[in-house]
Amino acid sequence: MLLGNFVQQPQGYKAFIPGQFPPKEMLAFSPAVHLTNDRATLALGKLDGIAQLIPDIDYFLSTYIQKEAAVSSNIEGTKATMHDALRADIGMTAYIPEDVENIFSYINAINYGVAAVQDSPLTLRIIRQVHEEMMKNTREGIGKTPGEIRKTQNWIGGTRPENALFVPPPAHELPRVLSDIEKFLNLPQPYSPLIKAALLHAQFETVHPFLDGNGRTG
């Protein structure tokens, strides 16, 4: 089943153009994937049960969000750690990397997104706002139009699209593919929640709709 094609662009490189998402024909997964999904779902159920016993769940969640923000930011090249963020939060700023701001912006973005979907479905508008919260007060957000869908070509790996490892769809394809993602987010699907989340994340990363910060936003 084709999920898209690499299409030659006028500029001389090939970009990946996603097909309809999700495909009309339901995606089939191996027994190993279904087994992993069942185990993960069971683990989440246990975690939810344990969480009910924690006296101060808000403190637990805030600490977990800090850890998630630090680890995800580290993957993207941030040098600051969760320990640095905790120290900076109480005013101990000596010897803390300047890019600790990336962790705080990520935390703000997560909190913003969680609050936004309490009274509203998850939409492209909210995703853009989350991206803006994450990027707007950081050095890496300078010149990267936080919260705005890209209008130019980006690429992954290499120094230009011609020698890149992967070139996402060109900007003029984004309205269509992002509309598919938004519909998939909010319409009933024949997939378990975890598999649906995995499909959404993979498609979002394939599309790479922002100039930067796609991994953490996705």
Which ranges hold each PLM region?
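FIC/Doc superfamily catalytic core
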Residues: 1-218
